[in-house]
């Protein structure tokens, strides 16, 4: 649940330029038009705020105001500070809008509408803006932001197209909803739903004017609800007058319609959900434009599910003919898509190409109207005639891409977290006039269905098909009984931070609702392989902690219509919602929520609730107080006097006051004008007086909390001892520094003493080099002095090189052998020379140089070995002595 940090900031309040976005127009005279004809303004949804990034579009009467919130905030915060602000400067600032002075980040957009704007609906690509009145629809071609940032005093006039100039007119039924189709090419497919249950699909293109004049598909839901065959006519009648009475005019009166988001799974992106005023809910699937572009995983996932459904229907002998017909129709529909060659079209931004498919013509262009849905586990005390629906909000199921991406776990992990951490069921939220929110689950799942063809032989006296059903998971109220008004029109608004959170806006206030406490636990239970105890755990989940709801704003004054809350999450602006009354903005800034990574499989065991003690709030945000409009409204007395001077009673102003019927009539008219204004001013002054009294109590609370903080600070700094003489802050700081230094020196001395003591009492572990050197010395001692000298030492390694002593013995043996051989050879040579003195050739033909070189080499080796042995002996003697 978000925590409120602050309410409307200074850069949105008067006299800041941001307040001009919501101020009423000076020449707005539309309020008197219904009164002139004796009519009453028909209630309806008020969605007068649309956003595009940090830009917002606000409808005020017949005007649209554009503003860049980031630029308005920056310009207001960077303004030069004023030394004094008085009534003169405030009045001058408030008159800037009337004078039409250009302001950075603010612009007026002129519209061709003839009535007050009720709704603003932004297209998915944020290049079209649908402008709705009670009966008409206009499409505004939004320019680039750079064109709107140009400072100009004149109103901006973008290109406007009238949608259905002969269809959506005042002589026909009112328009209740206009939603952009999530699968439209470049987001340019608009679906309009009128009050008389007529659905029209418009595929808009600025290059073809005809696309704004006629829809590509028009369906009369009253005809479709009574139809029995696929080839019947479901078109809309061209007559503008009612032919006669029909009970469907009451049962099929549409209150609202919506699509799930584009990234939903299954059939959800092409399912239009409709809420009727009578309390019924219908679904139309699949509803597609003539040219549509699916997400990358939509067609493969639908193809896999359809093939599995057809196989299951054929293999199951208990499947009904209706189930087999639906499976075959879905297979025929998907086969036509598979046989198509998609057309590659560049996106509106030009960054990538998209695949465009054509709507299948088989089994038919118009799907079956599914409904009305039955509500399982509906509250027993609820009466059907007491429920009057006003809005519907559908959260689509998460995409099931795990089966399609087997073996591609890396790519699966790289997909968005929201696609994995969601519910595999559609969630349908219904909102009634009384503020009751009903949360339902689509357990069976809405799939594509068509009416049977006429060629199919139906069974005589076949039982009617069971109506689809929705499981009522939770029902709760967002309004008190005293806050319910018959003309109130509550509305849903999505949240920018979570798909499972939304807002409910009503003239009484704004309520935040979050489904996260149970959504992920329910999904974990649905995906669990273990069936033991499932019923118990689901029952515990249903009866346990439900959805979070919190009234974050309450309108204290007389209830006036509030614009549907618009959620904005921007790094420059923060996380907040924006709404508005007829004259002032309503902004609530929240702490940026942490986005925890929810594991794929979470335990359904309810953890123990550990109450964390929050810090004591020494500053609580309070809503901004706006004085009543009666204090700023100009008096009607001067206008009445001017009218009296020019009317037939003007002689009475100059004559002496006399008791007559004419004088009584003048006094009576003047009393009506003055009493109305005085009554409004009295109420406004009384409210202002009560607010001032409340401010005194709030100020006392603030002073009390400040004193508590002061006492805590004095306790920490030591100023709470009243017996001691007063000490200056400088002395306290110096004393604390001196105590800290003494403490540091004491700790350092203690550490040094402990280090010395530890060094004396403990033996330091030998290093690896020291261990290797000791092992080498022990091996040398064993080799030279014998095995007895190495007893009690560490064990030597088995794989050592040849020991020096053995090498010395071998060298000595070789030397003796060579010396003996040399002497023998020399002796043999001498004997040969003596016996044969005349012989010129010796018996051994070895040159003397070679013999001398070999002998020298042998002698050098002997000297090196002797030196090595002497050095080892000396080293061992030193070690033994040490």
Swiss-Prot record:
Quaternary state and interactors: Component of the nuclear pore complex (NPC). NPC constitutes the exclusive means of nucleocytoplasmic transport. NPCs allow the passive diffusion of ions and small molecules and the active, nuclear transport receptor-mediated bidirectional transport of macromolecules such as proteins, RNAs, ribonucleoparticles (RNPs), and ribosomal subunits across the nuclear envelope. Due to its 8-fold rotational symmetry, all subunits are present with 8 copies or multiples thereof.
Q: Which cysteines are joined by disulfide bonds?
A: none
- Gene Ontology MF term list: structural constituent of nuclear pore
Q: Which PROSITE patterns match?
A: WD_REPEATS_1 (PS00678)
Q: Mainly localized where?
A: nucleus
Q: Name one GO cellular component term.
A: nuclear pore
Query: Which residue stretches belong to region Disordered?
Result: 76-98
Task: Look up the coiled coil feature and give its residue ranges.
Answer: 676-762, 806-829
> Quick check: keyword Membrane in the entry?
yes
Q: Which UniProt keywords apply?
A: Coiled coil, Membrane, mRNA transport, Nuclear pore complex, Nucleus, Protein transport, Translocation, Transport
Describe the task this protein carries out.
Functions as a component of the nuclear pore complex (NPC). NPC components, collectively referred to as nucleoporins (NUPs), can play the role of both NPC structural components and of docking or interaction partners for transiently associated nuclear transport factors.
Give the organism the record lists.
Chaetomium thermophilum (strain DSM 1495 / CBS 144.50 / IMI 039719) (Thermochaetoides thermophila)
What topology does the record note for this protein and the membrane? Peripheral membrane protein
Tell whether DNA-binding is among the UniProt keywords: no
Q: What is this protein called?
A: Nucleoporin NUP82
Q: Choose any GO biological process term that the UniProt entry carries and state it.
A: protein import into nucleus
PANTHER family, A to Z: NUCLEAR PORE COMPLEX PROTEIN NUP88, NUCLEOPORIN NUP84-RELATED
What InterPro entries does the record point to? Answer: NUP88/NUP82, WD40_repeat_dom_sf
Where, per UniProt, does this protein localize?
Nucleus, Nuclear pore complex; Nucleus membrane
């Amino acid at each position: 649940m978000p925590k409120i940090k602050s309410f409307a900031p200074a850069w949105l309040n008067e006299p800041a330029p941001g307040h001009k976005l919501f101020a009423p127009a000076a020449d707005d005279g539309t309020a008197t038009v219904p009164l002139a004809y004796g009519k009453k303004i028909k209630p309806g949804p008020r969605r007068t705020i649309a956003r595009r990034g940090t830009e917002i579009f606000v409808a005020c009467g017949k005007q649209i105001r554009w503003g860049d919130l980031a630029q308005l905030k920056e310009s207001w915060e960077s303004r030069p500070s004023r030394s004094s602000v008085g009534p003169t400067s405030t009045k001058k600032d408030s008159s800037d809008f009337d004078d039409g002075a250009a302001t950075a980040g603010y612009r007026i957009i002129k519209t061709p509408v003839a009535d007050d704007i009720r709704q603003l609906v932004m297209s998915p690509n944020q290049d079209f803006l649908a402008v709705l009145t009670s009966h008409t629809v206009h499409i505004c071609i939004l320019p680039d932001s750079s064109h709107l940032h140009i400072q100009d005093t004149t109103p901006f006039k973008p290109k406007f197209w009238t949608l259905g100039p002969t269809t959506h007119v005042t002589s026909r039924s009112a328009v209740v909803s206009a939603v952009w189709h999530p699968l439209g090419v470049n987001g340019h497919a608009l679906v309009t739903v009128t009050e008389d249950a007529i659905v029209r699909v418009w595929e808009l293109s600025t290059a073809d004017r005809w696309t704004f004049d006629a829809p590509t598909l028009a369906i009369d839901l009253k005809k479709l609800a009574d139809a029995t065959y696929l080839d019947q006519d479901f078109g809309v009648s061209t007559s503008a007058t009612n032919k006669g009475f029909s009970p469907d005019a009451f049962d099929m009166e549409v209150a609202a319609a919506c699509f799930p988001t584009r990234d939903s799974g299954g059939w959800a992106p092409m399912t239009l959900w409709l809420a009727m005023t009578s309390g019924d809910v219908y679904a139309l699937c699949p509803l597609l434009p003539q040219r549509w572009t699916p997400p990358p995983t939509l067609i493969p996932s639908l193809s896999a599910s359809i093939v599995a459904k057809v196989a299951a229907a054929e293999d199951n002998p208990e499947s009904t003919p209706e189930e087999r017909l639906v499976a075959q129709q879905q297979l025929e529909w998907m086969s036509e898509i598979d046989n198509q060659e998609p057309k590659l079209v560049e996106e509106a931004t030009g960054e990538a190409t998209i695949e465009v498919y054509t709507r299948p013509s088989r089994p038919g262009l118009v799907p079956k109207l599914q409904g009305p849905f039955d509500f399982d586990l509906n509250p027993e005390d609820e009466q059907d005639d007491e429920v009057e629906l006003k809005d519907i909000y559908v959260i689509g199921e998460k995409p099931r891409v795990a089966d399609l991406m087997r073996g591609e776990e890396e790519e699966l992990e790289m997909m968005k977290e929201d696609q994995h951490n969601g519910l595999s069921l559609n969630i349908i939220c219904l909102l009634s006039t009384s503020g009751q929110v009903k949360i339902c689950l689509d357990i069976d799942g809405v799939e594509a269905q068509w009416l049977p063809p006429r060629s199919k032989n139906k069974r005589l006296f076949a039982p009617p098909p069971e109506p689809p059903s929705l499981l009522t998971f939770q029902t709760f109220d967002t309004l008190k009984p005293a806050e319910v008004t018959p003309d109130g029109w509550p509305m849903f608004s999505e949240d920018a931070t979570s798909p499972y959170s939304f807002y409910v806006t009503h003239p009484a206030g704004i309520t935040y609702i979050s489904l996260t406490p149970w959504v992920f636990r329910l999904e974990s239970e649905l995906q669990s392989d273990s069936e033991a105890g499932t019923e118990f755990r689901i029952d515990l989940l249903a009866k346990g902690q439900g959805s979070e709801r919190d009234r974050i704003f309450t309108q204290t004054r007389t209830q006036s219509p509030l614009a549907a809350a618009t959620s904005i999450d921007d790094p420059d602006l923060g996380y907040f919602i924006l709404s508005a009354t007829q004259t002032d903005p309503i902004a609530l800034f929240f702490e940026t929520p942490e986005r925890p990574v929810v594991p794929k499989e979470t335990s359904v065991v309810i953890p123990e609730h550990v109450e964390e003690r929050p810090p004591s709030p020494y500053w609580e945000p309070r809503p901004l107080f706006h004085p009543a409009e009666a204090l700023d409204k100009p008096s009607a007395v001067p206008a009445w006097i001017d009218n009296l001077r020019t009317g037939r009673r003007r002689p009475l102003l100059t004559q002496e006051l006399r008791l007559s019927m004419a004088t009584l009539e003048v006094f009576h008219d003047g009393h009506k004008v003055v009493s109305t204004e005085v009554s409004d001013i009295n109420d406004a002054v009384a409210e202002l007086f009560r607010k001032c009294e409340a401010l005194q109590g709030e100020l006392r609370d603030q002073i009390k909390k400040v004193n508590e903080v002061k006492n805590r600070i004095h306790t920490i700094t030591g100023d709470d001892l009243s017996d001691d003489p007063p000490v200056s802050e400088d002395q306290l700081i110096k004393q604390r520094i001196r105590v800290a230094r003494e403490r540091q020196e004491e700790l350092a001395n203690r550490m040094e003493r402990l280090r010395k003591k530890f060094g004396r009492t403990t033996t330091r572990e030998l290093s690896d080099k020291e261990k290797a050197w000791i092992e080498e010395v022990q091996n040398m001692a064993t080799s030279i002095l014998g095995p007895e000298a190495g007893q009690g030492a560490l064990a030597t390694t088995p794989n050592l090189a040849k020991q020096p002593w053995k090498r010395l013995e071998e060298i000595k043996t070789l030397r003796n052998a060579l010396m003996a051989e040399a002497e023998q050879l020399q002796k043999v040579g001498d004997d040969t020379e003596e016996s044969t003195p005349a012989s010129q050739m010796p018996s051994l033909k070895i040159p003397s140089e070679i013999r001398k070189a070999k002998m020298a080499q042998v002698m050098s080796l002997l000297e090196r070995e002797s030196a090595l042995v002497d050095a080892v002996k000396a080293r061992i003697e030193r070690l033994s002595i040490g």
